[in-house]
């Protein structure tokens, strides 16, 4: 069949004018087209993106499609603004398919203005369990889930904005000594159980520690403010920008404003009363925040499905630091 990208985007945007939770039915061939075309672009762009401000940065979405549309209403629909998303598009919410399809469609339509990084949920071993596989199988088939897996294995994993703001989904890594280590990661790749790529997608800051400690998630590490400070100094950077953790106001600073956590799914999972946030970076690298207040509780886009909040992960033992 002839695939019309603009028609796909138009249909994906229709729920803007309907009630939250309305499903968008794309043809399976259209979704496969999105995964294949986007993969080609990801592979042809660097795994460590070098981007320029102005840009808007968003944290976890987790299938809360109506909230993704609200973010675009606030920030301007592409190509009105440049965007960088920090991962975790799927799982937990009810509309992972619409969410990832719109993001891939915009990536194909505006490859130099619209960027998405890999989160720890863009990984088959995680999204097999936490909702995305079930959604693909229920609405289409498990082969389509495999097509997304192949696409996710090619996503970029970090970005640097104007040589000053270092962005990733999770956090820093004790193995990260220079940026070329990231550039040398070859794709397609699965997320390993430990090491640099794992940490970029899984690590968390912790205000109660110094240095590195094992992470309660059972994967990767936590790191103290001292780690952030010395990392920024060494690499002549100003800010680490990451996602991966629910924060009450949608954004939260750490280490004397040298690290910021962004989370863009308000009322996360139907169980939290958090706001969502998007960070705007202007040409002078001034950062400002747009807040999505928690919407009313009757919203249909969140659903707990009784899934635990922190995914345990079957893994080999990682080396001690």
Swiss-Prot record:
UniProt-annotated binding residues for Mn(2+) 2: 88, 120, 169, 244
What catalytic reaction does the record list?
Answer: O-phospho-L-seryl-[protein] + H2O = L-seryl-[protein] + phosphate; O-phospho-L-threonyl-[protein] + H2O = L-threonyl-[protein] + phosphate
**What are its GO cellular component terms?**
cytoplasm; nucleus
Q: InterPro entries in the record, alphabetically?
A: Calcineurin-like_PHP_ApaH, Metallo-depent_PP-like, PP1_catalytic_subunit, Ser/Thr-sp_prot-phosphatase, STPPase_N
Q: Name the Enzyme Commission number(s) assigned to this protein.
A: 3.1.3.16
Keyword Chloroplast set for record: no
Signal peptide residue numbers: none
**PROSITE patterns with a match to the protein in the record:** SER_THR_PHOSPHATASE
Tell me the active site: 121
Cite the binding residues for Mn(2+) 1.
Answer: 60, 62, 88
- For whether the record's keyword set contains Metal-binding, the answer is yes
Q: Which UniProt keywords apply?
A: Hydrolase, Manganese, Metal-binding, Protein phosphatase
How activity is controlled: the entry says:
Inhibited by okadaic acid, tautomycin and calyculin A. Inhibited by phosphatase inhibitor 2 (dpiA).
Cofactor(s), by name: Mn(2+)
Q: Which GO terms describe its molecular function?
A: metal ion binding; protein serine/threonine phosphatase activity
Q: Which residues does the annotated region (Disordered) include?
A: 298-321
Q: Which Pfam families does the record cross-reference, listed alphabetically?
A: Metallophos (PF00149), STPPase_N (PF16891)
Record CDD domains = MPP_PP1_PPKL
Cofactor binding notes? Binds 2 manganese ions per subunit.
Q: To which protein family does this belong? A: Belongs to the PPP phosphatase family.
Relate the assembly described in the record: Interacts with dpiA.
Q: What does this protein do?
A: Protein phosphatase activity in vitro.
What is the recorded name of this protein?
Serine/threonine-protein phosphatase PP1
Q: Which organism is it from?
A: Dictyostelium discoideum
């Amino acid at each position: 069949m002839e695939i019309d990208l603009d028609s796909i985007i138009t249909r994906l945007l229709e729920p803007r004018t309907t009630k939250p939770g309305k499903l968008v039915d794309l043809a399976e061939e259209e979704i496969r087209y999105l995964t294949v075309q986007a993969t080609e672009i990801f592979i042809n762009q660097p795994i460590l993106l070098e981007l320029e401000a102005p840009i808007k940065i968003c944290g976890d979405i987790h299938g809360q499609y109506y909230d993704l549309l609200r973010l675009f209403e606030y920030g301007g629909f592409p190509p009105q603004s440049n965007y960088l998303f920090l991962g975790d598009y799927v799982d937990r919410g009810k509309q992972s398919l619409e969410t990832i399809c719109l993001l891939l469609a915009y990536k194909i339509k505006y490859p130099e203005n619209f960027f998405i990084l890999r989160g720890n949920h863009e990984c088959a071993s995680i999204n097999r369990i936490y909702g995305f596989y079930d959604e693909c199988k229920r609405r289409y088939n498990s082969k389509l889930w495999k097509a997304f897996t192949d696409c996710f294995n090619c996503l970029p994993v970090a970005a640097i904005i104007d040589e000053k703001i270092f962005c990733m989904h999770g956090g820093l890594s004790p193995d990260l000594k220079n940026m070329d280590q990231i550039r040398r990661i070859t794709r397609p790749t699965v997320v390993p159980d430990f090491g640099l790529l794992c940490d970029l997608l899984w690590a968390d800051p912790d205000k109660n520690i110094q240095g590195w400690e094992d992470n309660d998630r059972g994967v990767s590490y936590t790191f103290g403010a001292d780690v952030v400070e010395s990392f920024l100094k060494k690499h002549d950077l100003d800010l680490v920008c990451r996602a991966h953790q629910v924060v009450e106001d949608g954004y939260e600073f750490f280490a004397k404003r040298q690290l910021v956590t962004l989370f863009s799914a308000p009322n996360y999972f139907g169980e939290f009363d958090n706001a969502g946030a998007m960070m705007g970076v202007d040409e002078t690298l001034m950062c400002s925040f747009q807040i999505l207040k928690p919407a009313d509780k009757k919203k249909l886009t969140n659903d707990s499905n009784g899934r635990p909040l922190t995914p345990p992960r079957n893994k080999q033992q990682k080396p001690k630091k």
